[in-house]
């Protein structure tokens, strides 16, 4: 008993399907199958583009975060210097006043 999927068996099966359903019905079914495949490919392409967009957005936001982190220390340093200068000037006056009271 040979292979069930030999070319002659497939031809006989296809002829039986054609006889049972008719040409129009088979053509309609094949059209529906083609539409389904086309819709599937379209959705796969949209999903891939969506993933690429998300990756691109993540890369962009990472670059922006890195740039802001690089520029942030300068402003933080300036603020720290200002705080230190203001606390030194206030603290300096207070310590001088304390020293004078002690004497």
UniProtKB/Swiss-Prot annotation:
GO terms for molecular function: protein transmembrane transporter activity. The keyword Cell inner membrane applies. It is found in: Cell inner membrane. Keywords: Cell inner membrane, Cell membrane, Membrane, Protein transport, Translocation, Transmembrane, Transmembrane helix, Transport. It is a single-pass membrane protein. It comes from the Bacteria. Residues 48-103 are annotated as: Disordered. The chain crosses the membrane at residues 1-21. Its main location: membrane. Part of the twin-arginine translocation (Tat) system that transports large folded proteins containing a characteristic twin-arginine motif in their signal peptide across membranes. TatA could form the protein-conducting channel of the Tat system. The Tat system comprises two distinct complexes: a TatABC complex, containing multiple copies of TatA, TatB and TatC subunits, and a separate TatA complex, containing only TatA subunits. Substrates initially bind to the TatABC complex, which probably triggers association of the separate TatA complex to form the active translocon. Belongs to the TatA/E family. This is Sec-independent protein translocase protein TatA.
